[in-house]
Structure formats: C-alpha cells, structure tokens
Amino acid sequence: MATFTVNGQTVTVEKNQKLIRYLRDQLHLTSVKDGCSEGACGTCHVLIDGKPTKACIPQTDKLEGKTIVTVEGLTDWEKQVYTFAFGEAGAVQCGFCIPSMVISAKGLLDVNPDPTREEAAFAIRNNICRCTGYVKIIDGILLAAKIFREGKLPAPSADDWQMGSRVHRLDVEEKVLGYGQYPDDIYVDGMCYGGAVRSQYARARVLSIDTSEAEALPGVVCVATQKDIPGKVNVGHLKKDQPTLIGVGEITHYLGDSVALICAVDQETVEAAKKLVKVEYEVLPAIHSPAEAAAPGAPLVFEGDESNVQAYKHVSRGDAEGAIKSSKYVLTQHFSTPWTEHAFLEPECCVALPLDNGGVRLLTTDQSAHTTMHECAAMLGVDYDHCQVQNCLVGGGFGGKEDMSVQHHAALLCYLSRRSVKFKLSRQESILVHPKRHAFDMDFTMGCDENGIIQGVKASVVSDTGAFASLGGPVLERACTHAAGPYAYENFEIEGRAYYTNNPPAGAFRGFGVTQTCFCTETLLNEMADLVGISPWEIRYRNAIRPGGVLPNGQIVDESTGLVETLEAIKPAYDEAVKSGDPVGIACAMKNAGVGVGIPDWGRCKLIVEDDGKVHIYSGASCIGQGLGTVLVQVVVTNTGLHRDDIVYERSNTWIAPDSGDTSGSRQTLVTGEATRRACEKLKAELDSGKTLDALKGQEFYGEYLAKTDPLGADVPNPVSHVAYGYATQMCILDKETGRIKKMVAAHDVGKAVNPLSVEGQIEGGVVMSMGFALTEKYPIDENCKPTAKYGTLGLFRANQIPPEIQAIVVEKPGLNVAGGAIGIGEITSIPTAPAIADAYYRLTGEREFSLPLQNTPYAPKK
C-alpha cells in the first residue's frame, strides 16, 4: 500500500502494481499510453517529483509520498502552449507518442527555459517516435520554450484552410492533451478482456486441445476453439489462408497461430487461463528460408499446395539480355535486405461491443474499417449490418495494420459471450504476429553505354513471405515493376518469386517492396557512374524520365513528372558537399500513387449536412497519422468556399461512410481527395443557387472516383500501370571526421502539397525510418522461427541520434488533373534513403556494401 498525489489529488493504492496500470485502469488517465510495458518505447512518461519517468517501470508500493503529474494535470496555460506549439511546428502525426513527449518537454523546460536544439533532442531521447523523425517535435519544444519565456501565444502562421496552407492538423489538441481515443483508451462498464493461446511450435500438427481447466477458472467467461467459429474459419487480406484458430488435426504455420481464445473479467485472469489450456502437438520440420522452401522434397507450408511458391511475377520489355551484351559497361551484383518490424507505437487493440441485433460493433485501430468488416462478418457468418466497424485514432500503421491481428478474435469472443471485450496484443505478441517487411535476396545486372545511358537491366528477386500470403503477391509485383527505376530506357526484365516459410508473415510495409529493389538499382547506378567517369548526380540527370518519356514498363509519363526538378533542387547542396570534400551519396526513386495494374481502385466520399448545420465528411478511408482528415477538410474548404468552422471530419465507419479502400499504396490523398472534390462540386452547385447550409440540412452529396489502369502484361503499346507517380531525390552527407551523417537532403515531387507542413513531416519521418533500415534496424529470427528482438533492441533511431539537419524540399510540379494535382507521399519518403547512405559510406571508406543494414559505419553494433 502507498499514498501519493496524482495531479494534485491524494490517492491511496492498496494493491501493488505497475504505476501505468493504476493510472490507466483505475484513474483512466489516457494520456499515459501503453506502448510496450517493457520500459523501451517511452509513451508512458509521467513526472515523478518533477522528473520524467516511464510509468511502466515503478511499482506503486515504491511511490509513498511522491508527486505524480500527467498531461491531464498540466495548467490550462501549459495545455494551450503545448497544443499551439506542437500544432504550429507540425509535430503531431499519429499522436500516440505525443503526450509523453509533452511530459519530457515539461521536465526540460521547468529547469531549462531556453534550451538548445541538442538539449531538446537529448531530453526526449527515451521517447520513440516512428512517424515524424523527431525534427518537428524538437521544433515544437523550442517554440513552446519561446512562448513560455514571452508569456503570450502568437497568431498561427496560417488559418485559411485552403489547399496549400500550412494549417495545424485538425486533431492536434486531442492528441497533445491525450484525450483522443485509441481503442486501448476505451473502458466500458462490465468489459471483459481477451487473449490468445498461441502455438508452441512454428510447424506442428495439433493432436488435441483441452480447455476444461481454463473454463473452470473463476473469472473466465468463455473459451473458444475452432469448433466455436460460426462462419468461415480462414481470414486473409487477399487470399483467405490465415486460420482464425487452428483446429485439431491441422498443422500450424508459425508461432503466432492461435489454437484457443480466452475471454475473462480481467487481463490477469486471461493470462492465468491461457496457461491452463493443454495442447498436444506432433512436431514437424519447419521451413526457415526461401532456399529451404524451394529445395526438392521440401515440406509444404500449406498441405495440398503444389509447391511453397506463394507468388511469381515476370516483367519484361524489349531485349534486356541483348542490350546488356552490347553495352560498354556491365555490372552484376547480389543484394540482400532484411526483415524489418514496423514498430508503430500503438500495439494492436480492438474493443468489441455487442449490438442489440445480435451482432457486434468493433472499435479498431487498423488501415481499413471496411476490410475488417468484410473479414469479420464472413468469420461470424453474419451480414454486414451485424458486423459494424468504427475506426478510433490509429497509433501508426506503415502497412502493418492492414491484416487481421486482433479484430477477428475480439469479434468472435464478443459474439459468443454477448459481453464487451477488449483484445490487445502485448508488444512481444505484436512483434511476433503482424506481417513485417519482406526479406529479399536479389541479383541485378545493368548495362550502360560510354555516356552512362542505361541500355538494359536484368534481375531476379526472391522474397520470404512467411506463413501467410498477406500482401506478398502485390509487394512482389510492385518490387518488380519499380525495379527499373525512374529512368528512360527500354530493355528490362525481372523475375520474382515469393516463398512461404514458417517465419512470421510478411506483407505491406512503407515502400511496398520498392524499398528493396531501389537499393539495388540505385547502388549499381552509383557504381556505374564511377566506371563512366561522371558524377552520380550527372548519370541520373542524363537518364531521368521526363514528361512524354516512356518508362521501362511502357507507360508514357505525363506533365506532372518531376524527377528532373528534384535533381535540380538538390544540385546546389550536392555541389557544395563535393567541393568541400564531404562524402556524399545520392539516390532517386519513383513510387506509384494508387493500387494500379488494372485493379479497380475506388475513392468514395459522402458529404452530409447534419442537423447542426455543418458539413460532415464521411469516407471509409482510415486516417492513420498521415493527416488525411486535415487534407479532406482543406479539399472541402477550397472547393466549396465554406469556412473551416462549417466542416466536421468524421472518422471512418462502415454504416455511414462509403468504402474508400485501404489506407495503403500512397493512394488516399489522390483517390479519396478526388472523390471528395467531386462531392464538393455537387454541394457547391446548391450553395451557388442561393441555398444555405440550414436549408440543406439532411441532404447528402456523394462523390466517387475510379483510378483506371491497365493490368500487368496488358497487350497494349503503352499500358497505364498507375494513374500517377511521385518522384524523389535524396542525398546523404557525412562528417568526414566522425563518419556520422551530418545532413540528409530529400527533394520530393508531390504534385500539389495540400498541407506543406504535413508533407515536410512525412518526408522527415520517412527519411529517419529508412536511416534505420540502412544502418541499424534488425529483426533476427532464430532456428525455431521465433523473432528474438524486443522493442528496445530493434535498432530504432532516437531523437539524439538523428543528423543535425534533415532538409525537406517540397517540389510542386503541376500536370495531374485529379485531386487538385496532389500525389500521395507516404511511402516514397523512405525509398531512396538507403542507397544514398550506402553510397556516402562508399565515398568515405572505399568499400561498397550490398547488404543491409550496413556494417562498416559508426552506427553498426560493436563486434
């Protein structure tokens, strides 16, 4: 027992427990986020006697007489300052880390009211952010310090909400102050908790499951096994190959497979009951790698399949082999890139509520409410009216929240028990369960003429897609179609294979396969420049695709093509670095916006004038931290002339908001932005006729947009693979004395920057994320197909480790005739970073590396 104060109130805690559990579960102080409960991520900082402390570490019995402050306990003035400063700086994206950042900032500013940039970065060194790259959070802390010193709030730099305005994100306040709801922040009277009993072996036949002892444990509400599933057993994003539960007689695919589900009155009882479920296995040989999967006579991950090949792609145009043979310079190299964990700050969580009609409503944190509805309704065997989905705030995704993780399990337990159920993954479960970035092995050959003009590229790639298909096929396809790079040449051939293994599944990850193959193409191009005797910048400028040119996939690019402009944007900094003798590396990239390759790609939006006389925006598109809600409000303001205060953005749901597809593929700004613009045209016509919003109450204005493209391999001279591409050039400059990165420059063609503040934040965040991919991040898997990393050992960059400068250059190239010319930027920001960094280190050391993460750098673990 201990007595202490929390936000000025004296409390006595009888039961010894972690402080975070008391603050969240008893006091419901939701600014204290539970990101890992391992003392690693830093989302749970509170002030204890003025010192920022992770609340997941101290036990309440050790806090006698202490003074604890959370964001809820800040003064009104402090809340105003941090909300304004973080909004003005663009510091907020998914928001899950932000209240803890505020606490760390307060801990600094209370003792140092005028910190340097380095001191601010050091103060948040124990707070991980996966979205922003820290630059704008540090900006926000320094701005807050300035406001506190001066004693008054300045006016915002922009408030007109037109497209192109640097307005504060619409969700800044609820994220800064911690009252915005993520699923784990929801507490319902009588709510139960769920958990999964997972396989002890990556590949084994389940011989029996005995749940009797677990069912008899006091506090257990129900235990579910496969026989309790009323509908279809399998779920899956594209291919339904992922069992909701493994049944008796079936073979497990990886250690994350579930064999039973527990529903109980509290999490402690769930954990106790899981240990009482008895499962008997026949252990079988596991497949650890694509090489093992491809070996003659290899066991099949899926019984009944002809082989372990999950996907095969072949992309060809012209005569690559002939062109390479006739080239003056030819380079061939083998490359490999590793598994990568998304490491979003918010672990997967879903709250399932029983509906009066016998169905369920799911409060989720995923990348498509409608996809969740489709999969869970089929599993429950109910129609869509009996399986409703509402998105809460989403604490980061990056592709890792496209698949089922907890939603179907929460839905099943709620459906069976008729009780509200919260189902949340522990951080270790999250690291095991959700799909990762594919590990790739790649062989590339490039031929150039004496002037450095690419003549042909031939390649083969192999990916480990793990236990399930997830999005392995589309990732492989995108890796292959983009492997040619953003250059104007004709002869290209690539063959790709994705193999099932018993490793954790791999699926969507920021860059969607292009990150891996771009590393190869750009590294060879840098090496080729040295052979030809020209600069890496010059070889790209000579080969760069220009408006009206033809990409290696045959698509004729339009006037919005801005690769040359990105190269020109970084040229002064590149020349200055070369002149000063600093080691500098460069790389380019392109990335599609939208699904493309002939797959129907719909954006949909509904504008409803509600009883409050305001226009409410409804779209099934998930806002996962990229700022989609702000974008759509800016689109409505621009295209209707309405004031910002007349517009309300509603989070996606499945019973009002029309399906607008997944938040994936850098697509939502373009496809849902255009759908919203079309809905605005209809509303604007009514307003122009003299009607007021009051007169339009109850009316709906619907817009949809279909991004039409041609299938891969379409028999047309110049297929349209994608409706739009973004282009980028990034540059890495090293400190030649220390060998550390002193500056990253990233120039990105975005068409129209709807909110330049958000665009810059996306660029900075993508750069830092792929600095980790290039230099430090690792996801080791042992001989039992078990990932061995914890959150704190993944190699994520921290605020005091980023370069002194990350320069984001926003290039706006007109020409795209949809969505006001805006092209999504979520993925491309992370694509060219690794090859640019690798080339910079070659310029420093004289040694090229063809595998990631790089080993010959100051960032590599000491051997």
Predicted regions and their residues:
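Signature of N-terminal electron-transfer/Fe-S-associated modules in redox systems
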Residues: 1-156, 597
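C-terminal catalytic domains of large/alpha subunits in multi-subunit enzymes
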Residues: 226-227, 381-386, 416-421, 450, ...
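Helix-loop-helix junctions that connect adjacent transmembrane helices in secondary transporters/permeases
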Residues: 295-380, 544-614, 695, 699-720, ...
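Flexible, low-hydrophobicity surface segments
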Residues: 145-308, 330, 416
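Phosphate/diphosphate-binding loops
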Residues: 258-259, 264-266, 418-466, 673-695
